[in-house]
Curated annotation (Swiss-Prot):
Non-classical progesterone receptors involved in extranuclear signaling are classified in 2 groups: the class II progestin and adipoQ receptor (PAQR) family (also called mPRs) (PAQR5, PAQR6, PAQR7, PAQR8 and PAQR9) and the b5-like heme/steroid-binding protein family (also called MAPRs) (PGRMC1, PGRMC2, NENF and CYB5D2). Belongs to the ADIPOR family. Pfam families: HlyIII (PF03006). GO terms for molecular function: steroid binding. Residues 71-79, 134-146, 238-257, 313-343 are extracellular. It comes from the Eukaryota. Residues 1-49, 101-112, 168-216, 279-291 are cytoplasmic. This is Membrane progestin receptor delta.
């Protein structure tokens, strides 16, 4: 009879430095877990369990939205193509994150590679956002401007920059954690700021009363999305509350869990806001020439996927060539001072 035993959990001083999370003192999985152990650990309360489920369940929600909206009649209308393109990476990024958090304890190398793929999925999501924004959310005065025409191609280039910087940020993480964190934060903040330029401009136009905005009036869901994005960025960078009370939020309530929740809520509100723009502006946009047709959309997506996979492969190859004893793959024991702090 098959008997499954839940993996043993470790404290921070029992795992290599590469696995440490600031302010998280317990609930670590064995750093040489098997794939089965990793899957089983998702049903055990560890410091990663909530991280896994807060992105696994939303994956199915966004997939349901994609299937519901992607009915044959809806899919046949070219006007709806940018929305469907957006939903593809909206399904991908939480799934990639879920897998990264599940299998990151197999080895130091596996941990880095898992997060390389996670970062690549987020970069593609940033590109996916650009398609509906270019199609439905551009300010009226920007329509067919040079910025409008280059918006999606620039977002594709931004995805390469995002993947490259975020993957690179893992290499100096142990020696220069502050620099690594700043680099990774900037890698994701820049594509977000670029993608949302149309919304920021419309918000400026409408500040003080939507009655004067005309076609540039914003849905309240745009505001909720931007608020969730702001909270996500703050939680990702600040590492609160666990940084103020190490060990108190190891299993429930630490910043990465809250970051996941804010991120998926932001994506939900973003989808609702895009649907609102798509519906309210359709009569006006229907007479405008689309910036990208089916062929250009497929080509842009294909090149972006190939380019991001190439970047991930390059960093993975560099990682695999590193000798086993290097600090990035081994780390060192926790200093006595930190051991005393956790007691």
């Amino acid at each position: 009879m098959l008997s499954l035993k839940m993996p043993q959990l470790l404290r921070v001083h029992q795992v290599p430095r590469v696995f440490w999370e600031e302010g998280i003192m317990s609930g670590y999985r064995c750093p040489t877990s098997s794939a089965l152990d990793c899957v089983l650990s998702s049903f055990q309360m560890t410091n990663e369990t909530v991280n896994i489920w807060t992105h696994f369940l939303p994956t199915w929600y966004f997939l349901w939205r994609l299937l519901a909206l992607g009915s044959p009649g809806f899919r046949a209308d070219p006007y709806h193509l940018p929305l469907l393109v957006f939903l593809l990476p909206a399904c991908l990024y939480p799934f990639a994150s879920c897998c990264a958090h599940t299998f990151s304890s197999m080895s130091p190398r596996a941990r880095h590679i898992c997060y390389f793929l996670d970062y690549g999925a987020l970069s593609l999501y940033s590109l996916g956002c650009a398609f509906p924004y270019a199609a439905y959310s551009m300010p009226a005065s920007w329509l067919h401007s040079r910025l409008h025409q280059l918006f999606v191609p620039a977002a594709a280039l931004n995805s390469f920059l995002c993947t490259g910087l975020s993957c690179y940020s893992r290499f100096p993480e142990l020696e220069y954690p502050g620099f690594s964190k700043a680099l990774r934060t900037a890698a994701f903040a820049y594509p977000f700021l670029f993608d949302n330029l149309p919304l920021f401009y419309r918000l400026r136009l409408c500040w003080g009363g939507a009655h004067s905005c005309g076609r540039d009036a914003l849905s309240s869901n745009h505001g909720y999305h931007l608020l969730c994005a702001l909270l996500s960025g703050f939680l990702f960078a600040a590492r609160l509350p666990e940084r103020l009370a190490p060990g108190r939020f190891d299993y429930i309530g630490h910043s990465h869990q809250l970051f996941h929740i804010c991120a998926v809520l932001g994506t939900h509100f973003q989808l609702e806001a895009v649907l609102a723009d798509m519906g309210s502006r359709r009569a006006w946009l229907a007479v405008q020439e689309p910036t990208l047709g089916l062929g250009a959309t497929v080509a842009t997506l294909s090149l972006a996927v190939i380019g991001n996979l190439f970047i991930i492969a390059a960093f993975t190859a560099s990682l695999l060539r590193m000798p086993g004893p290097c600090p990035l793959l081994q780390g060192s024991p926790l200093e006595e001072g930190l051991q005393a702090k956790q007691q």
